[in-house]
Amino acid sequence: AYLKWAPLEGASSYNVYVDGKKIDAQLIRQYASYFRADVLGLKAGSYTVKVVPVDAAGKEMAGANTVSNLLVKNYNREGFAHFNFGGIGAYNNDGTLKSDAKVLYITASTAKTVSTEVITGAKNKKQTVKGLQAIIDAYQKGYDITPIAFRIIGKVSLADLDGISSSAEGLQIKGKTGYSTMNMTFEGVGDDATIYGFGFLVRNAKSVEFRNFAIMRCLDDAMSLDTKNSNIWIHHLDLFYGRKGSAADQAKGDGTVDIKGNSKYVTVAYNHFWDNGKSSMCGMKSETGENWITYHHNWFDHSDSRHARVRTMTVHMYNNYYQHCDVYGVGATTGSSIFMESNY
């Protein structure tokens, strides 16, 4: 849930309470003409939200505004990512954070310095790890599956990161072996959460969620599910085209959301594909097994091709909107199986 309000004269900041509980200050964002608060981790239901102005001395002022009976709905969890699986990433299926989940706030100024304790060895050996990519890499050791939510605030560029473990794509989320449980959520806060100048490589990972942010000018693919991934949920993203590549068909970068290497149980939903060259490749030539993928409620907006291009995978596509797509819609090729319904 989120709410917006006009600034009150004399207020330097605001506190926001949901059913009497104060939300994290990082969830309150100031824009040119308004403020916005994101209230994350609520289950479906009715809530009372109170916005209290705060003066320059940190004291709460008069003029609080209360909204009663704010109705919160759960995310649509249709699709193969949730098939026989509960709680992708850091959240339960009811929308609440898992009981032991960590929350880390990622901004341009904290991506290098954010830190947390990670189990990195036998007998519960722990160490404090600093930097976004370093924290993700520490999970690759396979000892720690503590759910973790990375909350992206504002614009985070390639130069802001502590490093990238994939020179081709950008941030790498990699499990120790195929289909390793990671329990990670990457989620945007506010109206302007943006990943700029890089994308994501996901490999050997299970239980990863991406939601509510934009990816712009990625290195190669915006989102590459490369090898042996499962239960991956990609939703409510704005996906712009990437940097120009060396090949003739890479004027707008390479792929946008590519799914291959025996990745399975993936849902791509409620995303806006903006003018992409190649929107989504699904499968290569050797996938076998339950490579079941769902695309639903996506908006392919002036994108050129691969909506999706499917090889050797089984895909369900429904309620997608194709607007002025230049080359072709869905491409069914080698060994593919596609069920399409209610697309426009």
For each of these PLM feature ranges, what is it?
Residues 1-11:
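Conserved aromatic anchor
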Residues 13-16:
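Short beta-strand elements bearing conserved aromatic residues within extracellular beta-rich modules
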Residues 37-63:
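Beta-strand-rich modules
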Residues 54-82:
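Extracellular fibronectin type III
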Residues 81-102, 106-149:
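Acidic Gly/Asp/Thr-rich repetitive segments characteristic of extracellular carbohydrate-active
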Residues 124-145, 161-185, 194-211, 216-229:
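Extracellular beta-strand-rich solenoid/capping regions of secreted or surface-exposed proteins
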Residues 155-177, 183, 239-252, 276-282:
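Acidic/polar low-complexity surface segments
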Residues 182-192, 206-217, 229-245, 255-256, ...:
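Right-handed parallel beta-helix
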